[in-house]
């Protein structure tokens, strides 16, 4: 039985990693060991940051909603506003609320009034 080598598979694997390392600076894009480490670290960061992106956007939406609510009515804050919307039966998610706060302040103002009315 003839001895086999893993040359083809190894070349494919190296090619895959070096293609992924295109655009990296210096040896990170050319040297096999350095490129492999850089690409794997990049994959770790992208996995982690896909999770973090969801949290960061939620924080951004909440910040925008809070700022818009306080601008419309000084007595309300974010948590009381969301409680008022829930009591009023308005089911709008934070992403849409933040978009309304930025693009259409009159519609957002009506939501603020409905939330305030349901609280009192």
Q: What are these regions, as identified by a protein language model?
A:
Residues 1-61, 67, 106-120:
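Intrinsically disordered, Lys/Arg-rich N-terminal extensions and targeting peptides
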Residues 27-31, 88, 93:
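Short, electropositive, low-hydrophobicity segments enriched in small/polar residues
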Residues 52-56, 72-73, 99:
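Short coil/turn segments at secondary-structure boundaries
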Residues 59-91:
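Mid-chain, well-packed structural core segment of small domains
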Residues 91-114:
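C-terminal structural segments of small proteins and small subunits
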